[in-house]
Swiss-Prot record:
Binds 16S rRNA, required for the assembly of 30S particles and may also be responsible for determining the conformation of the 16S rRNA at the A site. This is Small ribosomal subunit protein uS14. The lineage of its organism: Bacteria, Pseudomonadati, Pseudomonadota, Gammaproteobacteria, Pseudomonadales. GO terms for molecular function: rRNA binding; structural constituent of ribosome. It comes from the Bacteria. Pfam families: Ribosomal_S14 (PF00253). GO terms for biological process: translation. One of its GO terms (cellular component) is cytoplasm. The keyword Ribonucleoprotein applies.
């Protein structure tokens, strides 16, 4: 089990990313646009750098919804490998069966 503080930190990051997503996308579009003036591109770069670090989506970490485990998380299910296996063995995940050949 991950600490509550780690789970809360990730939740706070998700909210921050969602809050700044549109503004970041607009600034990145200006930076990439070759038709924009160099001054406008520079100002957009500075504005992007002044945003909070946690506003970047690359700082988010996928965690298990049940345990908060940061490694071995399946994106499709949002569960860590251990909890996914337990759920599959109970039959809680439709269409997921243990392999046998």
């Amino acid at each position: 089990m991950a600490k509550k503080s780690m789970k809360n930190r990730e939740l706070k990051r998700q909210l921050t990313v969602a809050k700044y997503a549109t503004k970041r996308a607009a600034l990145k579009a200006i930076i990439v646009d070759l038709n924009a003036s160099p001054e406008a591109r520079w100002e957009a770069t500075v504005a992007l750098q002044k945003q909070p670090r946690d506003a970047s989506a690359s700082r988010m970490r996928n965690r298990c919804r049940l345990t908060g485990r940061p490694h071995g998380v399946y994106r499709k299910f949002g569960l860590g490998r251990n909890k996914l296996r337990e759920a599959a063995m109970r039959g809680d995940v439709p269409g997921l069966v243990k392999a046998s050949w």
